[in-house]
Regions:
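Soluble non-cytosolic domains of exported or imported proteins
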Residues: 7, 11-18, 106-110, 130
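Generic enzyme active-site microenvironment
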Residues: 45-46, 93, 112
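Non-transmembrane alpha-helical segments in soluble domains
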Residues: 14-17, 21-28, 32, 116-120, ...
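Active-site His/acidic residue clusters
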Residues: 1-11, 51-60
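Metal-dependent active-site segment of extracytoplasmic phospho-/sulfohydrolases and closely related
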Residues: 19-58
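Ligand-binding/active-site lining segments
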Residues: 86
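C-terminal cap/loop subdomain of S1 sulfatases and analogous C-terminal strand-loop tails that border
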Residues: 52-83, 99-104, 108, 113-167
Length: 167
C-alpha cells in the first residue's frame, strides 16, 4: 500500500488488515493440510469496537470510518476504549466445516466468557455452575432454529477506568 495516495495511517491500517488476512489464511490452510479442519472450531474476533484515532479534515471520523452497523447503517455511539455500544459491540466469526453452516448470520448477544462453556460442552466436559459464560452451541450449530433453545444472558457487565456498563 506504499504507493496508494492515502494518508500514512490508512496505508498502515490496510497493511495490518492484509497481514492478518494472510496469517489467518495460513492457519486455516495448515488445519486443512493436517486433516484437522473438520475437527477444529476456529473463533475470530476483536477485543473492542472500532477506533477513530486517525481523524483528519478528509476523514473526521477516522480513516476506517465510524462504528456503523453493516446491516442497518446505524452508527454506534463510542469507540475503542470506552463503554458505549461502539466500544463494546464487536463481530465474531466462527468456522467449523461440516458443523457450522457457511454464511450463517446471528444477532445473538455473546461475550468472551461464553467461549469456555461453548468449547467445554463440545468436548463433553461438565462446567461448574458458577461460570459466568453460557454455551452458544445451539446458535453455532443451528440447533436453536431446530428446537433447542439458546440460553441468553440476563445482563452483561463491563468495567473500564472507573466506569461501568450493564446491559
Amino acid at each position: 500500500y506504499r504507493d496508494e495516495p492515502w494518508p500514512e495511517q490508512a496505508r498502515r491500517y490496510a497493511a495490518m488488515v492484509s497481514m492478518v488476512d494472510r496469517q489467518v489464511g495460513e492457519v486455516l490452510d495448515l488445519l486443512k493440510d493436517l486433516g484437522l479442519e473438520e475437527n477444529t472450531l476456529v473463533f475470530f474476533s476483536g477485543d473492542n469496537g472500532g477506533a477513530d484515532y486517525f481523524s483528519n479534515k478528509e476523514h473526521p471520523r477516522g480513516i476506517h470510518g465510524a462504528n456503523v452497523n453493516p446491516q442497518t447503517g446505524v452508527e454506534y455511539r463510542g469507540k475503542k476504549g470506552n463503554l458505549y455500544e461502539g466500544g463494546l459491540r464487536i463481530p465474531m466469526i466462527a468456522r467449523w466445516p461440516g458443523r457450522i453452516a457457511p454464511g450463517q448470520v446471528s444477532d445473538l448477544l455473546w461475550y468472551f466468557p461464553d467461549v469456555l462453556p461453548t468449547v467445554t460442552e463440545l468436548a463433553g466436559v461438565t462446567m461448574p455452575d458458577d461460570i459466568d459464560g453460557l454455551s452458544i452451541v445451539p446458535e453455532l450449530l443451528g440447533e436453536s432454529a431446530a428446537g433447542r433453545p439458546q440460553p441468553t444472558h440476563d445482563y452483561l457487565y463491563w468495567e473500564l477506568g472507573g466506569q461501568t456498563a450493564i446491559r
